Amino acid sequence: MALQGWLESLKAAQKTCILQDGRRKVHFLFTDGKEMAEEYDAKSHELIVRKWRQKSGLGAYGQWQIEVGDPPLPGAGTIQPDFLKESSSNPTFTRKDTKSSFQWRIRNLPYPKEVYSVTVDKKDRCCIIRTTNKKYYKKFSIPDLDRCHLDLNENAISFAHANNTLVVTYEKPKEILSIEEELQREVKSMKATTDGDVECKTQ
């Protein structure tokens, strides 16, 4: 069963934990060589960041791919002319979950709520945001459901719009809540170091 398989992968992964800047940072090294790093609020235990990376065929680590949390700023760490920088008025797509739902925020969308539609494509296993004025279109998957081979549910998705931000919410199925609860128990039981700015790593 895929659901049980993902849970077993989490349990079998090498894990290290560090408390830093009010966050519990957990690093997972899976048996296939992939790495996952998660950051939780140390008080509320809500997930703030989840990112992945894996080695290339040459053995070099690739860049971290953000799954949950704010993506790095365009051009962060590089110097580039102003005319090459991404406009701050462009829509930005960010996933920020709550304990009961997956949630995405698309900022810089000034159109009224009635312009938007959010649907589920079960065949392609993705959610689709459309606008009647053809100004915005976005397809995105829910990796958590893919990892557990869980079907998308049209009734679980909803959206709201305020302050130029579209908020799309997908209620977590009970299977995901069960896995997250079990993972939280394991994470909370881990001995966390508090050694300053040392990044969580598994040797």
Swiss-Prot record:
InterPro entries registered for this protein in UniProt: DPCD (IPR026224)
Organism domain of life: Eukaryota
One Pfam family cited in the UniProt record for this chain: DPCD
Family: Belongs to the DPCD family.
Protein name listed in UniProt: Protein DPCD
